[in-house]
């Protein structure tokens, strides 16, 4: 089993770049919310999760719940949706559950560790998913992470006065 060890020097965080996994997961939830918002569908599915609005479309939901128009982290919207079982049906894979749980409880996540933990679980005990599913999910996350990191704007103008 191959493992990758990443050693960071903190340069990105020292310059307030949103490069933590928590930032990435918030971006992921934001993509889902934006897809719903501009879509007439009431279902979203990928290999990590499935979200369904039971009674209306996302546009109707956003219109009737003005709080969604007030900016706040997307993971807060998703948390509200997960808690509203009357109007929403949410299914997360164990991998995404572990990632979100780690962020919620510790304020950070090590995605590679979560993957490795579940991979060991697949090997040593019967689970409702196979290692192939887990590998597909990790590959999806990697693809999404590349897209996310490519979208981060690192060039910004800093006024000269800032350096005086």
Model-derived segments and their meaning:
Residues 2, 16, 133, 137:
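Conserved aromatic-histidine-acidic binding/catalytic patches
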Residues 2-12:
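Short, hydrophobic/glycine-enriched beta-strand segments
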Residues 12-18:
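Short N-terminal binding/cap micro-motifs at the start of the first secondary-structure element
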Residues 18-28:
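Short secondary-structure boundary/capping segments
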Residues 23, 33-164:
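Active-site periphery "cap/insert" segments of enzyme catalytic domains
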């Amino acid at each position: 089993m191959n493992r990758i060890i990443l050693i960071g020097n903190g340069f990105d965080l020292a310059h307030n770049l949103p490069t933590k996994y928590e930032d990435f997961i918030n971006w992921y939830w934001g993509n889902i919310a934006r897809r719903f918002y501009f879509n007439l569908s009431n279902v979203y599915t990928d290999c990590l999760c499935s979200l369904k609005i039971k009674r209306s479309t996302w546009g109707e939901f956003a219109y009737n719940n003005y709080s969604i128009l007030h900016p706040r982290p997307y993971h807060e919207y998703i948390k509200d949706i997960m808690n509203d079982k009357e109007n929403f049906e949410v299914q997360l894979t164990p991998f995404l559950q572990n990632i979100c749980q780690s962020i919620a409880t510790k304020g950070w996540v090590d995605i590679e560790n979560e993957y490795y933990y579940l991979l060991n679980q697949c090997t040593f005990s019967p689970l409702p998913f196979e290692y192939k599913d887990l590998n597909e999910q990790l590959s999806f996350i990697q693809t999404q992470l590349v897209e996310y990191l490519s979208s981060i704007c690192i060039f910004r103008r800093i006024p000269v006065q800032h350096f005086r």
